[in-house]
């Protein structure tokens, strides 16, 4: 039992150092780096098994200390044993030791679950930030694509406008050419009439 309590005390010291470090006014970047290194260190399968076994041992010592402390307290306050001859001072010393062990184990378990939960929260925050960075990058790429499409759309609108203008000019030139041809044929017909000649179409009919 003394060996287990020594082990629990060492674990408690490590947890206190760990929590004290993260209560210091250090940058969030440094905290994340430490958390990431610890996650790599204790994220393996063997490390997880070791931590679970260690937590189980602390829980066993905690429960054993509470049970023994309760039994000794009950023994000291039992009316039948009040007048019995036994070393009450020794029993009080044992009860004090078990109560001390229960306090140390309880605080150790509390810090253990606190650190475990904070590690999970930091891991979730890191994943959220990574997702946020990826989303921001994708959004930026989408905005660049949209800007490129809008620019191409403006160019297409300009080209369509120019094509419509050219089409109108072509229609105007075509109409003008048709009018010029009609006028030319009319003048040629009048000219032929003045010369007393028949049009080619009439000659073919003859």
From Swiss-Prot:
<feature type="transmembrane region" description="Helical">
    <location>
        <begin position="3"/>
        <end position="23"/>
    </location>
</feature>
<comment type="similarity">
    <text>Belongs to the BCAP29/BCAP31 family.</text>
</comment>
<dbReference type="InterPro" id="IPR040463">
    <property type="entry name" value="BAP29/BAP31_N"/>
</dbReference>
<dbReference type="GO" id="GO:0005789">
    <property type="term" value="C:endoplasmic reticulum membrane"/>
</dbReference>
<dbReference type="GO" id="GO:0070973">
    <property type="term" value="P:protein localization to endoplasmic reticulum exit site"/>
</dbReference>
<feature type="transmembrane region" description="Helical">
    <location>
        <begin position="47"/>
        <end position="67"/>
    </location>
</feature>
<keyword id="KW-0812">Transmembrane</keyword>
<dbReference type="InterPro" id="IPR008417">
    <property type="entry name" value="BAP29/BAP31"/>
</dbReference>
<keyword id="KW-0175">Coiled coil</keyword>
<feature type="topological domain" description="Cytoplasmic">
    <location>
        <begin position="123"/>
        <end position="206"/>
    </location>
</feature>
<feature type="topological domain" description="Lumenal">
    <location>
        <begin position="68"/>
        <end position="101"/>
    </location>
</feature>
<feature type="topological domain" description="Lumenal">
    <location>
        <begin position="1"/>
        <end position="2"/>
    </location>
</feature>
<feature type="short sequence motif" description="Di-lysine motif">
    <location>
        <begin position="203"/>
        <end position="206"/>
    </location>
</feature>
<keyword id="KW-0931">ER-Golgi transport</keyword>
<dbReference type="GO" id="GO:0006888">
    <property type="term" value="P:endoplasmic reticulum to Golgi vesicle-mediated transport"/>
</dbReference>
<protein>
    <recommendedName>
        <fullName>Endoplasmic reticulum transmembrane protein YET-like</fullName>
    </recommendedName>
</protein>
<keyword id="KW-0256">Endoplasmic reticulum</keyword>
<feature type="topological domain" description="Cytoplasmic">
    <location>
        <begin position="24"/>
        <end position="46"/>
    </location>
</feature>
<dbReference type="GO" id="GO:0006886">
    <property type="term" value="P:intracellular protein transport"/>
</dbReference>
<keyword id="KW-0472">Membrane</keyword>
<feature type="coiled-coil region">
    <location>
        <begin position="140"/>
        <end position="198"/>
    </location>
</feature>
<keyword id="KW-0653">Protein transport</keyword>
<dbReference type="Pfam" id="PF18035">
    <property type="entry name" value="Bap31_Bap29_C"/>
</dbReference>
<feature type="transmembrane region" description="Helical">
    <location>
        <begin position="102"/>
        <end position="122"/>
    </location>
</feature>
<keyword id="KW-1133">Transmembrane helix</keyword>
<dbReference type="Pfam" id="PF05529">
    <property type="entry name" value="Bap31"/>
</dbReference>
<comment type="function">
    <text>May play a role in anterograde transport of membrane proteins from the endoplasmic reticulum to the Golgi.</text>
</comment>
<dbReference type="InterPro" id="IPR041672">
    <property type="entry name" value="Bap31/Bap29_C"/>
</dbReference>
<keyword id="KW-0813">Transport</keyword>
